[in-house]
Amino acid sequence: GKRFVAVSHLVPLGAASPFEVETYLLLGLPRSLGGEGFCGIELNVEVALSASARAIVGKSRVYIDLLLSSPDGRRQVAIECQGKASHGRAGDGLRDADRMTALQAMGYDVLLLTHRQISDEDRFRAIVKAICRMLDAEYRDKSSDEQRAETLLRSELFVDWTKLGVIDGKMPVRRKTARSWTAAVLSE
């Protein structure tokens, strides 16, 4: 609805998948909007590796899906979104393990996050508490209003993303001469 469109403007550029967007919104939105209120989340952060980390992964740089930092900047948590597509080819799991080990060798706390973990409220709450521990931040239970906001956010996030924007079987498209969205059949 209108709320989802408003919230979607809060997502920075750089998300590589709907899973990363969902995770970013759940962690980064203010609690009043249903998120956890973590500040300063960065998406797809390029990390130049040290010599020892390069020896582990065989690359000079890697990318972190989401990077959370403590308010004082002294602690960081690298979150790697482990979507279904990330392990589609033989050897992907081993490459991911090498990348995580290289980041850990450089001092990063690394969390591997699955869609199942973010979509299940109890699992997600446990992950949030773990992130707080890693960042040396205090976790505070949500108020009843914040819980309602989270329920609403989850109902809008966990949808079929391939159907977003479809109205009566038609996809809104932007016409070069138009100043507003108009519905058009996809084959146009």
Cite the ranges covered by each PLM segment.
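Surface segments flanking catalytic/ligand-binding clefts of nucleic-acid enzymes
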Residues: 1-188
